């Protein structure tokens, strides 16, 4: 993915369009590396991957254009030559003889003053069809997205070519070669189409959730063929497509095509890659199972909104009108996924309309309440209110033309004054914004209030802007300083909306204090907006911006769901086992007035089984949190289909605690199609070249029992390959802990009650840099008929990759343990389990030969 997901990219594009000085700064061409870098012993920093590719320095995201050419694998990648956050996007370059040992090469394709270089692919133009080389010296051709430095951020497809085997690149003078006038048209992957004898491009129409196919005979002139989608998961934009054939069960006569698409609406509600298996006829792709045709469990209908009325439900406000909607309302994209002729759609006259729709009380008679929901992603927040300030004493409201008396500023923030901005949540017309007209997000510095006496219990802060907590590289924070020590801190939410944060400071009553604003961030969302500071004896309540479906028990919210910023409704299910026999109500709430400030809902049904949402029905390459932008190697010499992904997550990619680099790739995987229970499924395994890193003598254990405890094993290491066969026994949960020590560990286990494999990184080490990082990531998996679980686990200094179910299920997660925590342990909770066999191999660093 070339840019972070919404709302970030739109904010960045708008900001860039409004601030020419920021554009000029970003457009400065980087200085390419002068020579190849083989890092060796330098790759010893904390968290540095030892057998996963990472650049020596700076930011990296999507892998681009991997290809085997003249005895070497070439890997290109999205790269910022000037820093450790997203920006200045160019193509970095590395080479390897074996997919394991990588040498970083000089910068391949740099940004320039007209465009950044976004993702794409590389082909070997053996016949010189492009005319960019000669018959004797045909070119390598990179097909990539040019992201224009224009107000609309137009994205077009361009070419660069190499006549020296990929060492140096020249941009084609006729760029762009494909322009449809869109700002969401990116990430081309090109392959040779044997059926038509021409080049085939798959490229994403990101905001439409479509992949478009084009054909060309010379890589310069492209003809539109067809589109695929929307289909499968559409909770985030579509990016980084790939299309390739695979033989089923190794039989070339039974070849299917696989289309992969990256999206930010995956199984962990974030970064992921989905795939479709189907057929490609040379012009269009047809999925065998697009995951769109679904019949939910039958049940008792509460309301389907199909008779032209709300059926006794009570509407208040302006968002619902007098009757259900027939589908799409004027001014929006088409609504899809609803059942029957009517649904609830609160886009009535636009997103500014607000209100509630409340059902009559009904009795819960079945375990599940299934329904469809769509629209804006604005969850219900407990304790929220109207956004007003409680009674109190104003420290600063930033409504004047200059800073309040006594405030001081340093660095690039010196000279900043409040600016007039129309921000949702603002209590006045002005705000203190560290995004400066001259430098944009690049401005850094501090702003400090005069001393004051703490004479109220709470300090309420109205803030917005970047989410860069204290202690991370490039923080954007507001802090309370008492006796020279920071005692409270808050940051933004990567949002242009202002909302309240509140500190309980009663313990400091009577003490002298200051408020300090720190902006050390220079990348996207590298700024803060502060709308006011207030001392009060009441906590300020965050503004209620929900677009949600809530279940009320005695008037209190006990379940809640929201949309995914999509006009496609999807099934959601609530388990109401604890509420059977109780009287409840459904509330549909639209309290948002900004973008995506509406909710869609339909088909409330009590049932004995849960309905499955699209994310549950879609097919995923990886169920972990850190796998994205997967792309396959062109011209792989062994006839394999090998993919490499970006091992990171857009939610926290610019906050992970690594330095002087930020970003790594997954270990290369080989893909295959196999038949399981009559279905064609995709299986994955690490490429066999991993064996080159194995130490000679593995540790082996057999028949190891464990009951209600953690059993340390006599083996340790930060870079390991583990093969395990575990038997469930009576345990509720069982598995292995890696990077174990000092009270920290990462658990890779199985939950017998839910039937799920999981990676638990809640106690894995450093996790506080983002609120979503400390989490348990789960995926459904059946044990074998004998109650056994086979695992293959790749452990590196800052990651785990878990292969299970004979490669049908993979979970990839980053972790950031203390370097001294290298233990391995067997564990079982709630009963007994057993390791029938364990093999642990130490892996040598790929950076030291």
Region annotations inferred by a language model:
Residues 341-368, 376-380, 432-456, 499-502, ...:
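Short beta-strands within extracellular/lumenal beta-sheet-rich domains
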Residues 1-36:
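Secretory targeting and sorting signals
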């Amino acid at each position: 993915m070339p840019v972070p997901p919404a709302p970030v990219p739109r904010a960045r594009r708008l900001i860039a369009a409004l601030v020419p000085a920021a554009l000029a700064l970003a457009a400065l061409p980087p200085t390419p590396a002068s020579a190849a870098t083989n890092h060796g012993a330098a790759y010893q920093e904390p968290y540095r991957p030892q057998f996963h590719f990472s650049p020596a320095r700076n930011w990296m995201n999507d892998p681009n254009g991997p290809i085997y050419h003249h005895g070497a694998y070439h890997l290109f990648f999205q790269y910022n030559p000037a820093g450790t956050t997203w920006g200045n996007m160019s193509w970095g370059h590395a080479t390897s003889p074996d997919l394991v040992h990588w040498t970083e090469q000089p910068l391949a394709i740099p940004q320039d003053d007209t465009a950044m270089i976004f993702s794409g692919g590389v082909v070997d133009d053996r016949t010189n069809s492009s005319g960019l080389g000669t018959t004797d010296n045909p070119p390598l051709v990179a097909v990539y997205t040019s992201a224009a430095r224009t107000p609309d951020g137009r994205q077009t497809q361009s070419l660069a070519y190499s006549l020296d085997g990929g060492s140096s690149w020249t941009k084609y003078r006729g760029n762009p070669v494909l322009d449809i006038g869109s700002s969401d048209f990116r990430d081309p992957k090109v392959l040779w189409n044997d059926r038509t004898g021409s080049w085939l491009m798959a490229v994403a129409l990101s905001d439409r959730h479509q992949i478009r196919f084009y054909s060309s005979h010379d890589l310069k002139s492209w003809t539109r063929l067809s589109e695929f989608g929307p289909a499968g998961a559409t909770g985030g934009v579509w990016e980084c497509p790939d299309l390739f054939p695979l033989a089923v069960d190794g039989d070339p006569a039974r070849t299917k095509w696989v289309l992969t698409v990256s999206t930010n609406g995956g199984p962990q509600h974030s970064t992921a890659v989905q795939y479709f298996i189907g057929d490609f006829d040379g012009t269009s792709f047809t999925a065998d199972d697009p995951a769109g045709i679904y019949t939910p469990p039958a049940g008792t209908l509460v309301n389907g909104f199909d008779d032209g009325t709300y059926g006794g439900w009570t509407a208040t406000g302006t968002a619902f009108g007098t009757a259900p909607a027939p589908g799409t309302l004027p001014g929006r994209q088409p609504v899809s996924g609803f059942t029957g002729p009517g649904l609830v759609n609160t886009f009535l006259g636009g997103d500014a309309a607000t209100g509630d729709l409340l059902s009559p009380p009904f009795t819960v008679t079945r375990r599940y309440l299934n329904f469809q929901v769509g629209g804006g992603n604005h969850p219900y927040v407990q304790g929220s209110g109207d956004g007003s300030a409680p009674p109190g004493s104003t420290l600063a409201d930033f409504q004047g033309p200059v800073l309040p008396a006594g405030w001081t500023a340093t660095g690039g923030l010196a000279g900043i004054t409040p600016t007039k901005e129309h921000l949702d949540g603002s209590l006045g017309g002005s705000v203190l914004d560290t995004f400066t007209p001259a430098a944009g997000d690049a401005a850094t510095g501090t702003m400090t209030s005069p001393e004051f006496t703490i004479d109220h219990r709470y300090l309420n802060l109205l803030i917005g802007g970047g989410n860069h907590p204290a202690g991370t590289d490039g923080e954007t924070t507001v802090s309370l300083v008492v006796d020279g020590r920071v005692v409270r801190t808050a940051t933004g939410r990567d949002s242009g909306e202002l909302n309240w944060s509140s500190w309980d400071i009663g313990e400091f009553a009577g003490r002298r204090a200051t408020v300090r604003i720190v902006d050390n961030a220079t990348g996207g969302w590298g700024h803060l907006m502060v709308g006011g500071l207030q001392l009060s004896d009441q906590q300020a309540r965050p503004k209620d911006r929900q677009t949600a479906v809530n279940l009320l028990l005695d008037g209190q919210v006990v379940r809640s769901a929201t949309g995914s910023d999509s006009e496609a409704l999807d099934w959601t299910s609530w388990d109401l086992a604890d509420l059977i026999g109780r009287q409840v109500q459904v509330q549909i709430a639209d309290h948002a007035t900004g973008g995506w400030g509406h909710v869609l809902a339909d088909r409330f049904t009590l049932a004995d089984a849960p309905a499955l949402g699209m994310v549950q029905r879609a097919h995923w390459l990886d169920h972990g949190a850190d796998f994205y932008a997967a792309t396959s190697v062109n011209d792989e010499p062994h006839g394999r289909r090998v993919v490499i992904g970006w091992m990171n997550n857009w939610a926290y990619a610019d906050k992970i605690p690594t330095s002087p680099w930020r970003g790594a790739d997954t270990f290369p995987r080989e893909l295959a199609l196999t038949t399981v229970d009559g279905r064609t499924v995709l299986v994955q395994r690490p490429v066999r070249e991993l064996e080159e890193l194995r130490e000679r003598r593995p540790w082996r254990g057999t028949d190891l029992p464990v009951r209600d405890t953690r059993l340390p094993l006599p083996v340790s290491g930060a870079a390991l390959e583990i093969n395990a066969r575990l038997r469930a026994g009576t345990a509720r949960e069982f598995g292995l802990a890696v990077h174990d020590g000092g009270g920290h560990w990462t658990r890779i286990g199985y939950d017998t009650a839910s039937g799920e494999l999981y990676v638990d990184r809640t106690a894995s080490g450093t996790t506080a840099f983002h609120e979503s990082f400390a989490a348990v990531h789960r995926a459904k998996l059946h044990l074998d008929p004998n109650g056994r679980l086979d695992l293959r686990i790749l452990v590196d200094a800052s990651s785990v990759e878990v292969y299970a179910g004979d490669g049908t299920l993979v979970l990839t997660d980053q972790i950031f343990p203390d370097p001294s925590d290298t233990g391995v342990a067997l564990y079982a909770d709630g009963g007994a389990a057993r390791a029938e066999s364990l093999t642990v191999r130490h892996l040598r660093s790929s950076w030291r030969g």
